Amino acid sequence: METRATLRGVRLSVDKGRLVADLIRGKKVDQALNILNFTQKKAAGIIKKVVESAIANAEHNDGADIDELRVKTIYVEQGATLKRFSARAKGRGNSISKPTCHVYVVVGN
């Protein structure tokens, strides 16, 4: 039995998200939440909410036992990039890219 949760379009670099996702892949959910609590990264708080959502989905929709759940799959994909413009001296301009990503979490036995 597998249950999933997704978060799309979050303002986070895909590389920074993957760095945290690699920490909890394959771990039990209580151990994964403990790791995320003590990881001092912006991505840790975002991914923690998605993992908690997947746990709640498994408990409510499938009636799963929380103690047996593991993070089976977690991956972070690149989303759309917000492109902005910053005015510079002498009529020039620089482009600023603000990346987004999508977080997918699958929990199961």
Swiss-Prot record:
PROSITE patterns recorded: RIBOSOMAL_L22
Coiled-coil features, chain-numbered ranges: none
Protein function: This protein binds specifically to 23S rRNA; its binding is stimulated by other ribosomal proteins, e.g. L4, L17, and L20. It is important during the early stages of 50S assembly. It makes multiple contacts with different domains of the 23S rRNA in the assembled 50S subunit and ribosome.
Protein name per the record: Large ribosomal subunit protein uL22
CDD domains: Ribosomal_L22
Taxonomic lineage from the root: Bacteria, Pseudomonadati, Pseudomonadota, Betaproteobacteria, Burkholderiales
Entry GO MF terms: rRNA binding; structural constituent of ribosome
Entries under InterPro entries matching the protein: Ribosomal_uL22, Ribosomal_uL22_bac/chlpt-type, Ribosomal_uL22_bac/org-type, Ribosomal_uL22_CS, Ribosomal_uL22_sf
Family: Belongs to the universal ribosomal protein uL22 family.
A Pfam family hit: Ribosomal_L22
Assembly behavior: Part of the 50S ribosomal subunit.
Matching PANTHER family: CHLOROPLAST 50S RIBOSOMAL PROTEIN L22-RELATED (PTHR13501), LARGE RIBOSOMAL SUBUNIT PROTEIN UL22M (PTHR13501:SF8)
Disulfide bond annotation, renumbered to this chain: none
Natural source organism: Polaromonas naphthalenivorans (strain CJ2)
Gene3D superfamilies: Ribosomal protein L22/L17 (3.90.470.10)
Signal sequence annotation: none
GO term, biological process aspect, one: translation
